[in-house]
């Protein structure tokens, strides 16, 4: 195997590894649930986060008050909330 073939193989392996690790990292969801959000919005704000991993510490990426933001989660869903609200993530 020539040195150029070896280099192409090593670069390909490195890229596959990086993509695989990034995919695993994004799938991790932090503990707790998003607070109930009963605010009606005419227009959504730009997202401040996309996944829980974008948020520092224990904060989760939740749709709250017209946009995705990093917020402190609640242990249980508050009365009047909808546990399925979390499925609207982009």
Curated annotation (Swiss-Prot):
SMART domains hit by this protein: WAP
UniProt keyword Hydrolase, yes or no: no
Location in the cell: Secreted
Superkingdom classification of source: Eukaryota
One GO-annotated biological process of the protein: antibacterial humoral response
InterPro entries: Elafin-like_sf (IPR036645), WAP_dom (IPR008197), WAP_four-disulfide_core (IPR050514)
Stretch forming the signal peptide: 1-23
Domain WAP: residue ranges: 27-74
Primary location group: secreted
Keyword NADP set for record: no
Residue pairs linked by disulfide bridges in the UniProt entry: 34-62, 41-66, 49-61, 55-70
Keywords of the record: Antibiotic, Antimicrobial, Disulfide bond, Protease inhibitor, Secreted, Serine protease inhibitor, Signal
Gene Ontology cellular component terms for the protein in this record: extracellular space
Gene Ontology MF terms in the entry: serine-type endopeptidase inhibitor activity
Pfam families: WAP
Its job: Antibacterial protein. Putative acid-stable proteinase inhibitor.
Record-linked PANTHER family: WAP FOUR-DISULFIDE CORE DOMAIN PROTEIN 12, WHEY ACDIC PROTEIN WAP
Name the record gives this protein: WAP four-disulfide core domain protein 12
Organism, scientific name: Gorilla gorilla gorilla (Western lowland gorilla)
